[in-house]
Amino acid sequence: MKNRVTAPTWAEINLDNINFNLNNIRKLLKEDTKICTVLKANAYGHGSVEIAKFLENKNVDYFAVARLEEAIELRENNIKMPILCLGFVPEESLEYALENNITLTIYSLEMAKKLNDISEKTGITANIHIKIDTGMSRIGFEASEESIDQIVNISNLNNLYIEGIY
């Protein structure tokens, strides 16, 4: 295999442009519509911590990341806004997520029950979003009567607070 020499690549992010875009998007929405800024994969390679620090004082309601490690990185950099973890979180990391005030994605009744038990043990109510599988066959509840019943069961768990569904 030959060694390849490649030119360095970089992207310059103009924060004023982000602010301009955000303000224009906000104008199109109803006043009480919430905005979640997705910062997964280091804000798609543009610096999640830097972007989060900039947006924290703007008219944004949530941040979202793919993995728990990304959420923890934001918390370790003093990001206080709500952070939704969109992806899988191992059972052994659920308590750590709760302790760091990370909103979790629920994609099965089994996971919800485990999280409810951990929430009860720690005394920390878990904020959650319910994930619906929209056809990608990754994670989420299928469009079925059984899933509806499971989501109703989740809504009756005492230590979980359903903030949203996607």
Predicted features along the sequence, with ranges:
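Alpha-helical packing segments of well-folded alpha/beta enzyme cores
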Residues: I18-N21, I25
